[in-house]
Amino acid sequence: MANNKSSKKRVEIGERNRLQNKAYKSALRTLMKRCFTACSAYIEAPGDEAKTTLTTSLNAAFSKIDKAVKRGVMHRNAGAHQKSRLSIAVKRAIEPSVS
């Protein structure tokens, strides 16, 4: 347990940041799930509306990942890894012959 004033403050700040990062990561995971869901929906029923939904969900997820990396919530290599996963899923949905 923290004994002096500055160490108590650091504990409070760390807890605050942990909760903020947790919320940010949760929102990020939600956007990624939406993108994967849009991929499977496009595979089931390809069309202009499904493709628009797919691209908008991909853009939103990419934006959130980039912001998470910028804020320090996620390591840049982890961000690149997640963006790669999303890109591969979208590419496979749009062009099924490419695996």
Curated annotation (Swiss-Prot):
Short name of one Pfam family for this protein? Ribosomal_S20p
Query: What biological process terms from GO does the record include?
Result: translation
Q: Which terms in the Gene Ontology molecular function aspect does this entry carry?
A: small ribosomal subunit rRNA binding; structural constituent of ribosome
Q: Which InterPro entries match?
A: Ribosomal_bS20, Ribosomal_bS20_sf
Q: Which domain of life is it from?
A: Bacteria
Q: Which UniProt keywords apply?
A: Ribonucleoprotein, Ribosomal protein, RNA-binding, rRNA-binding
- Looking at the keywords, is Cytoplasm present? no
Question: Which Gene Ontology cellular component terms are annotated?
Answer: cytosol; small ribosomal subunit
Instruction: Please describe what this protein does.
Output: Binds directly to 16S ribosomal RNA.
Q: Which HAMAP family match?
A: Ribosomal_bS20
Sequence similarity: Belongs to the bacterial ribosomal protein bS20 family.
Q: What name appears for this protein in its UniProt entry?
A: Small ribosomal subunit protein bS20
